[in-house]
């Protein structure tokens, strides 16, 4: 058996073990213990030409919405984004993401799954699927820190003249991926500092060509000012490396006004 086939076999076994473990524990969660929900709607704009690198992509208007629900046994989070609203329909793009942590053996270890889809009328469409394991044990009054590791399966419409489509195994998302939140008060005003970060490793050849690198970085650092009970203003430093169709490191600044519910 070739090394490539052995790798595919190992990946398949890991997926099967992960799914079987999650399914095995699902009957125990037929009556979930509800903890709470959260969500928000936001509107604003992103400036690709500010930040540390001028990517020469201009300013884009955007709207976003997110919703999450937490149980003792599992957590679910979803996100929607519509971009480039100041351009004609042909130049707009839309993003939908759904993510979950399901606790294993009543512990802080979790089955982790994420589906991320992007539909772009001018560049291309892709659907990314991550599955692996996470951890929910790091949280407190200071906020939370939720790492996860996983395999990456990708489906896209990019076709390389040399390597073919990007579809199929697309490497890994490994240990240095997190979501963190830190609430604090300054001058009697409430703020929240949050960060998400993903590093993609060992991409397939076609996706490597499309994104200009075998590995890639994708993330955002946000500070939100809770200036009224349900209203907030936020600034995000969005950073990426060999991602979003950009060769090398790039960034943008995002300015949003939002309503929490």
Segments and roles (model prediction):
Residues 42, 56-59, 82-177, 211, ...:
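Outer-membrane pore/translocation modules
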Residues 1-36:
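Cleavable N-terminal export/targeting peptides
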Residues 152-230, 239, 259-261:
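Outer-membrane beta-barrel transmembrane domain signature
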Residues 73-78, 104-111, 140-145, 182-194, ...:
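Repeated loop/turn-to-beta-strand initiation elements of outer-membrane beta-barrel proteins
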Residues 249-261:
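Outer-membrane beta-barrel "beta-signal"
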Residues 29-83:
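Short glycine/proline- and aromatic-enriched beta-strand/turn motifs that initiate or cap beta-hairpins
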Residues 45-49, 71, 82-86, 115-121, ...:
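Transmembrane beta-strands of outer-membrane beta-barrel pores
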Residues 39-43, 67, 78-80, 111-113, ...:
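Membrane-embedded beta-strand positions of outer-membrane beta-barrel proteins
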């Amino acid at each position: 058996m070739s090394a490539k086939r052995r790798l595919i076999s190992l990946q398949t076994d890991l997926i099967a073990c992960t799914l079987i473990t999650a399914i095995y524990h699902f009957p125990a969660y037929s009556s979930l213990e509800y903890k709470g929900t959260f969500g928000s709607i936001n509107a604003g704009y992103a400036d690709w030409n500010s930040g540390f690198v001028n990517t020469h992509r201009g300013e884009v208007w955007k709207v976003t919405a997110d919703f999450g629900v937490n149980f003792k046994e599992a957590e679910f989070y979803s996100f929607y984004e519509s971009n480039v609203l100041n351009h004609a329909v042909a130049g707009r793009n839309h993003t939908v993401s759904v993510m979950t942590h399901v606790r294993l053996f009543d512990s802080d270890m979790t089955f982790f799954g994420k589906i991320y889809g992007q539909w772009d009328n001018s560049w291309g469409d892709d659907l990314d699927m991550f599955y692996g394991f996470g951890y929910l044990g790091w949280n407190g009054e200071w906020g939370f820190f939720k790492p996860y590791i996983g395999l990456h399966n990708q489906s896209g419409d990019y076709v390389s003249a040399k390597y073919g489509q990007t579809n199929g195994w697309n490497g890994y998302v490994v240990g240095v991926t997190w979501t963190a939140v830190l609430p604090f008060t300054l001058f009697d005003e409430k703020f929240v500092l949050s960060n998400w970060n993903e590093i993609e490793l060992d991409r397939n050849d076609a996706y490597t060509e499309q994104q200009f690198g075998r590995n890639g970085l994708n993330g955002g650092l946000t500070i939100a000012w809770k200036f009224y009970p349900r209203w907030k203003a936020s600034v995000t430093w969005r950073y990426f490396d060999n991602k979003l169709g950009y060769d090398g490191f790039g960034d943008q600044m995002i300015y949003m006004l939002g309503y929490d519910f």
